[in-house]
Regions:
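Aspartic protease catalytic domain
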Residues: 2-5, 9, 24-34, 41-46, ...
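Active-site palm subdomain of RNA-directed nucleic acid polymerases
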Residues: 15-24
């Protein structure tokens, strides 16, 4: 199932990104849904470009790797030691209606794609078009969908432990 949510913005490392507001407006050809049946998050093209630019700028110290179907992948392994590099993943947050903030763990948007390779797990969607917050980004949270009162509640949870 999927549920419409109101996104007011997205931030990377606490900096609110300059994404046109109409991207989040269903009446202007945009909008956002939370979909448990879609794995990766898909952002409408204007939002995608801004979000991946901000994330990739923070990951610029890592060598880029080409790996379909992802556009932004990085070699996270030191060529000299074979160990994972200690490069911090920037924080990503979706600012929702009612001052709610969805701040997923890094593993939900910078995902392991192959040994030593991590990719930005967000895909580019059409514009105009609806953005989709997929189930990988929803992980490590408990969700409550109150359809009768049209409310969504969520909280961080170590569901896997």
């Amino acid at each position: 199932p999927f549920y419409a949510v109101t996104v007011n913005g997205v931030s990377v490392d606490g900096e609110l990104l300059k994404i046109p507001r109409l991207v989040w407006n269903i009446e202007r050809g945009g909008g956002t849904i939370l979909d448990s049946g879609t794995s990766l998050t898909v952002l409408a093209s204007p939002a995608y470009r801004v979000v991946v630019a901000a994330l990739s700028k923070k990951l610029a110290a890592l060598p880029r790797v080409i790996m379909d179907p992802f556009e932004y992948c990085y070699n996270w392994t030191s060529p000299s030691t074979g160990e994972d590099l200690a490069v911090p993943v920037p924080d990503l947050a979706f600012h929702l209606a009612g001052a709610a903030r969805l701040q997923p763990p890094a593993k939900s948007y910078v995902i392991d794609a192959a040994p030593g390779v991590k990719c930005i797990g967000v895909q580019e969607g059409e514009w105009p078009g609806v953005s989709v917050i997929g189930n990988i980004l929803q992980q490590e949270h408990l969700w409550e969908f109150d359809t009768k009162n049209r409310r969504l509640r969520f909280m961080r949870s170590r569901c896997t432990q």
